[in-house]
Amino acid sequence: MNKITLTAALAVFFINANAQELITNKKGSEYLFTVVTDIEATEVQSQGRTGTCWSFSALSFIESEIMRLGGGKHELSEMFIVRNTYSDKAEQYVRMHGNLNFGPGGAFHDVTEMIKEHGIVPLDVYTGNPTNEEKFNHGELDQVLLGMVDAVVEAKQKTLTPLWRPAYEAVLDTYLGEKPEQFSYNGKQYTPKSFTKSLNFNPEDYVYIASFTHHPFYEEFVLEVPDNWMMKSVYNVPMEEMMEVIDHALMNDYSMAWASDVSEEGFSFRDGLALVPIDGANIKKTGKDNKNYSDAGAVKESTVFDAPCEEKEITQEMRQKAFDNYETTDDHGMHVTGIVKDQTGKKYYIVKNSWGT
């Protein structure tokens, strides 16, 4: 029923599991988790070297919703969403004379808005990988697109020609492939819009929530993060109520898309765990994360990833301060699919990532 966006500090567990199993986060760990609820999700995909986690995580959520609604299991095309988003973002960037964030990042509402405007297609129909590379790598594409729109905005002429739009679309066609107007899937013919209708998924049925004190609670506001280029609104609630909404949704078979911060010391993809220990200074960090947070990043070593530890009690004030001073951001989107508890009774959230494992 609810699609939820947030940037809360949560204890997170990165392994899918079946109820009643005792599981752990990695070999040799003393953590023992019991599954409370685990919602059906599609297979993990890899965003590769791209900044498109927002598309992968939101579509994963939508795929789970389609299954929950009885529409069957479908792998949807993340790059079809990306392709359409990049087109609309370029149009807006030029109209704003370059005074807009232009990059590969995005927000969950980008996905629902693109589905409403353009529809969606299965992954097999549009891979967004015309050269069949082993993994996506948009390093070159991102620079080419930015160079094009900047050249248009900064052109030393009195008026713009309409030629930049087809030129820009040609670049997207080259790097991601031409968009299908019609296609065959499971023995039937579809357009992107008719296929979307067949899934019985209505983007209007979902809401976005957040928890910040610089806006009134129980009202909508435009979340001030660079990737919110559409300037869409979220519904603001107190942090404790936000967590209650999350737990209620998960316990009633509704998963959620989660805008998270994976630059925190306690986030360790390699250890399959994310938490907020009392003393984060004891976490030894080697290397660094890439700018798009599209892989496991820096190596982190600490006993907190090996056995249950004492964690900070996060308050509304702590959360707000971290957001205000840029310590906590929305740098990575993931899909929360369940709840587990460790041997001490502490709660964690099962999270599906888009880093290929």
Predicted feature locations:
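Bacterial Sec-dependent N-terminal signal peptides
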Residues: 1-22
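Catalytic-core signature of thiol
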Residues: 21-313, 320-357
